[in-house]
């Protein structure tokens, strides 16, 4: 973070300062355990924890200033709403960086693929700041903005939403120069009034562009392509022949895609992705289009994207265990679209070996939940996945559908808990198996994935 004074912070958030006006702030954190000397500690009040209780610990660790919503015995800025104040601070700070240097804001949204595309750009663009993990909400995104400094040329932001207006708020903090919309799917469907509502929410990113900014849109997704009139400049990507940035001569080997990038008719060198899953071709093309808009050359950008590794945890992480069992950990999140993509990746990685899909509930599906899980069970059987293990009552319709579709005997199984899933797998897995673990993060199924990765039977 570029150093700022306590007075500057107070002015930015329209708060009341009770501290040395010239005290210097050099970082912003919301966890007292992450405080370093010079930090601004942001005291959030949560359902179970009140951040104000940790102000003494923050001071002991060297915090210069605290952002609070109640009086504390420490140098502080007092505000009515800490979350809104954090957004205001990030908004003012980005404006300051823009006046002092050349910084390009690249924002990514979409029902699936946001974090992967962000991670690809973080490993491709020079002088870049991007979050690790999925820091894409009203708290995480401002903290990412505040991690940039005067040397930052590219600020990559992930903008998520679970309802209308969320992305519009995030773009009010950090209006993007480059806006990437990956897809309109059914993730968080419970927060919207149907597919059109989801599309309108994702379009908020395009509406939030700076004047003259460019929208990078998926030509393969009709709802995304329809956002083109909202932007002054548009670059498209995808498999469609009309896309500005597309993939030619696509092949797959053990789940990893290889293709020739074509940009407005000009072919680059073949690139083979390190990421597992054909669906990552879309993410790679989006990242490539953004990198080109940021001034990179085709072959340089494509080479860096090809060699990029998974950074954020529990996202298509493939581990080949010493006992001959391969684990695909994609347990961070789940939607119908990402589940289907993960099933295909499972089959590709297995290359004819025995396949085991361990799936949990897709959360935040609202009234569509039962039907979505039912369709998932049908899909698993139709694809020819050998064994389907469904974990948790919320996902049980997937098991019921698999049985109805013809998954007999022990080809499909239902267990009520992660502990039961652990026992089931320990009795059945053998060398040569490829196991996919996937569910929404809130199910906790990632704990099982971690155990499977650590186990070297």
Identify the function of each model-found stretch.
Residues 108, 114, 313-316, 339, ...:
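ATP-dependent carboxylate/acyl-activation modules
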Residues 69-73, 101, 178-326, 378-381, ...:
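Acidic, Mg2+-coordinating active-site environments of NTP-dependent enzymes
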Residues 85-219, 225-232, 427, 451-456:
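Phosphate-binding loop of NTP-binding sites
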Residues 55, 59-60, 171-172, 381:
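Non-catalytic positions within long, well-ordered alpha-helices that form the structural scaffold/packing
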Residues 1-107, 117-122, 146, 270, ...:
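Short, basic phosphate-binding NTP loop
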Residues 9, 39, 58, 89, ...:
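Residue-level signal for inorganic ion chemistry
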Residues 47-49, 312-314, 331-407:
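Active-site beta-alpha connecting loops in nucleotide-dependent enzymes
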